[in-house]
Amino acid sequence: MLITNIETIPGKNIVKHLGLVQGSTVRSKHVGRDIMAGLKNIFGGELRGYTELLEDARGEALERMKRQARGMGANAVINVRFATSSVAQGAAELFVYGTAVVME
């Protein structure tokens, strides 16, 4: 399945717009990661634990969106966007959405 953040694909024709599709996941922080993040905030550096957490969350949300698009008969999702929000103390939602289409 083709996933893109642009509205058109050069050389491809959109033959049908199927509508909005989305995927999301809510993740919470790990106490051990919080301790390491606190130290990194003092000394500087990448928060690798959080980087991995967000990479996993993006992948899961994207797979959920693709599954919804396939269920609608799409072979592509265009104009894809990611968003994050805090849903509770220590927990965040990663949300991805786009337009399911049939391309040829």
From Swiss-Prot:
Q: Which domain of life is it from?
A: Bacteria
List where this protein forms a coiled coil: none
Q: InterPro entries under this entry?
A: UPF0145_dom_sf, UPF0145_YbjQ-like
Q: Which Pfam families match?
A: YbjQ_1
**Family under the similarity heading:** Belongs to the UPF0145 family.
Q: Which PANTHER family match?
A: UPF0145 PROTEIN SCO3412, UPF0145 PROTEIN YBJQ
Q: Which HAMAP family match?
A: UPF0145
Name used for this protein in its record: UPF0145 protein HCH_01985
> What organism is listed for this UniProt entry?
Hahella chejuensis (strain KCTC 2396)
